[in-house]
Amino acid sequence: GGEEQFDDYGHMRF
């Protein structure tokens, strides 16, 4: 998505 977020497993997504 662009912003740093954490998925339901706690992994960083960008």
Curated annotation (Swiss-Prot):
Function, in words: Myotropic peptide.
Family annotation (Pfam families): Sulfakinin
Family stated for the protein in its record: Belongs to the gastrin/cholecystokinin family.
GO cellular component, one term: extracellular region
BP terms from Gene Ontology: neuropeptide signaling pathway
Tissue expression as described in the entry: In larvae, both sulfakinin and sulfakinin(6-14) are expressed in the CNS but not the ring gland, thoracic perisympathetic organs (tPSO) and abdominal perisympathetic organs (aPSO) (at protein level). In adults, both sulfakinin and sulfakinin(6-14) are expressed in the brain and thoracic-abdominal ganglion but not in corpora cardiaca and corpora allata (at protein level).
The protein, known as: Sulfakinin
Compartment(s) of residence: Secreted
Residue numbers carrying Phenylalanine amide: F14
Keywords attached to this entry: Amidation, Neuropeptide, Secreted
InterPro entries cross-referenced by the UniProt entry: Gastrin/cholecystokinin_CS (IPR013152), Sulfakinin (IPR013259)
